[in-house]
Curated annotation (Swiss-Prot):
Keywords: Antiport, Cell membrane, Hydrogen ion transport, Ion transport, Membrane, Sodium, Sodium transport, Transmembrane, Transmembrane helix, Transport
Protein name: Na(+)/H(+) antiporter subunit G1
Primary subcellular site in the record, as a coarse category: membrane
Purpose: Mnh complex is a Na(+)/H(+) antiporter involved in Na(+) excretion.
Subunit structure: May form a heterooligomeric complex that consists of seven subunits: mnhA1, mnhB1, mnhC1, mnhD1, mnhE1, mnhF1 and mnhG1.
Gene: mnhG1
Xref: Pfam families: PhaG_MnhG_YufB (PF03334)
C-alpha cells in the first residue's frame, strides 16, 4: 500500500517536472532577449530538473527500497549551479552591452553599479 503511494507521488513529480521543463524550453524559444531567456532557463529548468530527479529518487525508495545518494548530490548540484549559471550569463551579457528588448522599462542594474566600488 505505501509502495503504491510513494510510486504515485514519484510519478506526479516526474510529470510536473517534465511539464515545467517543457515550459522552460518554450520560454527560451519565445522570449525576446537574452535576459528573459536566461531567466526562463535559470528558474524553470532548474525547478523542472529538481522535480524530475526528486521523482526518480522517490521511485527508487518505493520500488527498490534503498536511498540513492547520487540523486541527492545531483539535486544539490542543480540547486546550486542552475541559478548561478543564469546569473553569470546575464551579468556577462550586461557587461557586453547586449541590448534589452523594447518592453524593458528601466534599468536597475545601472543604478546599482554607480554605488558599487570596484
Amino acid at each position: 500500500m505505501i509502495t503504491t503511494i510513494v510510486i504515485s507521488i514519484a510519478l506526479i513529480l516526474v510529470i510536473i517536472g517534465s511539464l515545467i521543463s517543457a515550459l522552460a524550453a518554450i520560454g527560451i524559444l519565445r522570449l525576446d532577449d537574452v535576459y528573459a531567456r536566461a531567466h526562463a532557463a535559470g528558474k524553470a529548468a532548474t525547478l523542472g530538473a529538481m522535480l524530475l530527479i526528486s521523482g526518480v529518487f522517490l521511485f527508487f525508495i518505493g520500488r527498490e527500497g534503498y536511498v540513492n545518494m547520487q540523486l541527492i548530490v545531483g539535486i544539490l548540484f542543480i540547486l546550486i549551479t542552475g541559478p548561478l549559471a543564469s546569473h553569470l550569463i546575464i551579468k556577462s551579457a550586461y557587461n557586453l552591452n547586449t541590448p534589452a528588448s523594447k518592453r524593458t522599462k528601466h534599468d536597475e542594474i545601472k543604478k546599482d553599479l554607480k554605488n558599487t566600488k570596484l
